[in-house]
Amino acid sequence: MSKRRRKATFKAYNPDQLSLLPPSLEDLIPANHVVRVVRSVIDQLNIDNILKKYKGGGASSYHPKLMLKILVYGYLSNTYSSRKIEQSVQSNIHYMWLAGMETPDHNTINRFRTEKLKDVLKEVFAQVVTLMVEQGLVDIKTIYIDGTLSLIHI
């Protein structure tokens, strides 16, 4: 009795296959992904203090909410380097979705962080935390360590 070896079969694979329509980034991101929370919270922020820092004339700028979204998501993903955030905006679907397929470079990201957020970062952070608490996304508890007020996520 001889055993015939069966030939392995594989699913069709053609990386060069064209498709009629490219997939929507919206369809590729799960409904419960944290990137959706970032987008929702940043969209609700009052950014008047940031908008005041922009002067009229010259080349158009990336919208401050776009820049905040990619920075906040970067920080949540432990990505702090403007160069790494730039790379992510070009290659990671979550960043692409947040940025609406816009691609700010590392210099633009860094200038936004150092110039536009310079005096308002604490206010922006406070708004983000407040919105997240109001929406039940986080619970905070006040604790004191060595006399320092700290907020922790429970």
Regions found by a protein language model. Name each.
Residues H33, L68-I70, I85, D105-I109, ...:
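Short, conserved catalytic/metal-binding motifs centered on acidic residues
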Residues K84-Y95:
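DNA-recognition alpha helix
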